[in-house]
Amino acid sequence: MTAQDYERLDLWLWHARVCRHRQDCAALIEKGAVRINRQVTRKPHSKIRVGDVLGLPGHPRPEVRIWRVVALASRRGSASDAALLYEVITENQGES
């Protein structure tokens, strides 16, 4: 009955379809390309909660994407399900 109020960062990124494979999500985090609430993290096991703000590298251009976590997932769903996990704050503004 007690649902977790957090999720591993690499797992959430995989659920949100940032990368095709969870290992790719972990590699992205380990190289320091992801920020949680403006803090760089290199730990795939970092915990995120609803309301956290993530900074992600843009693709294919190098701009930064800023997303707010609005939901946690228990499984990887369709692309439309993944879009419900975050709110785009800003995308492709070129700020680093």
Which residues does each predicted region cover?
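Strongly charged
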Residues: 2-11, 15, 23-27, 35-96
